[in-house]
Amino acid sequence: MRNRVRVLKKRANSITWRVRVQMMTRLDPTRPNTTLYDSAPRRPTRLDSTRLDPSQPSSHSLRGSPSHFVVAFSRGRGRIGSLDCAANPTDQSETGCDGHNKMKDIRSQFEKNGFVVLEDFFQPEEIDELKSCGEEFTTNLPPENERKVFNTLELQQNKDKYFLDSGNKISVFFEAEALEDNGKLKVHPRVSLNKIGHALHWLHPTFKKYTFDERVKEAAFQLDYQEPAICQSMYIYKNPGIGSEVIMHQDATYLYTEPVKLVGFWIALEDATQENGCLWIAPGSHKSGVHRRYVRNKDPESKELLVYDRAAPCYQLSNFRPVPVSKGTCILIHGQVVHFSYPNKSDKSRHAYTFHVIETQHTSYSKENWLQPPPGGFLKLYRN
């Protein structure tokens, strides 16, 4: 705690960015037959007082108009210093500006919806620097004999081992549609990669600089993280035409702590739209627990080193809302909120940099997780 206070005192000026508040369909505890997901052949799980409302039309349109707030953080007090409405004053009753009653700070919105949109989190020139570094990886690809395509059960063990070994490295992951079986590219190198992971935040100087930036520390502080640590990082390409779908999931499935205290920082390096594969999030779904785990396989005879502990839930698509954002925006994603993205079939890429932060104080990180800490532990956010 003393270290955190000392770090905060070093900061000179308050940070200002824009928090976007979208009036979406939220939890409806009055509907007794509402379910978040059905998982055959098991009986649908009921969510009691934290149900989602599936009665909304399936067009996925947003209710109401997005509104914006300028948030100036008071570092010394560790809470919001001021909250000024930047939306149309006539819309205050709908957007929640009236008296600051509905949306007072980042934490209240995060706890209510399971995510927060912070616009202008990084400046355009900073985003361009990150994107330039991401594009450099496409000019220095591994040799063909190291570009592996894992498409059979026999090779599943090799796939899992490569994934496990990537935790403390900068590893290259290709798009499935980018390679022939022999490793030759079917597409231009610039659009061949799915992602780079999982230790960019420490092993690459530029990504390290922005991961441990004061704005990141401030956001974690606002979410009441006492001793946060960065456990993984990824550069996501979502290339035009072949950018893969990301299935509906919770981040806590893969990075489980007890109790769960996990937040993802998802930073848009380009405009993310419905056309090029923006995130879709189910507001309030973080209140429904962890639906399944992705763990190390205890069966020594199995070809699979990593397995899910239960079948995939069947989520209702009507519960999800698109979250299109502009370049430079950061979305804070609760570890239990369900989210996904469609394949990118457009002619525009959708690059993003993302990393995950866990609480290390009064929590335990599961030894069953695919990603395990290095000998010295995960890197502490406030101390670097």
Protein language model features and the residues they cover:
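Short, conserved beta-strand element in jelly-roll/cupin
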Residues: 256-273, 324, 356-359
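Polybasic, lysine-rich low-complexity intrinsically disordered segments
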Residues: 3, 9-10
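Non-heme Fe(II)-dependent double-stranded beta-helix
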Residues: 85, 92-112, 119-246, 379
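Residue-identity detector for glycine
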Residues: 2, 64, 76-81, 96-99
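Methionine residue identity
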Residues: 1, 23-24
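Double-stranded beta-helix
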Residues: 272-337
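Short polybasic linear motifs
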Residues: 14-17, 26-59, 66-70, 89
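Non-heme Fe(II)/2-oxoglutarate
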Residues: 140, 144, 167-169, 287-299, ...
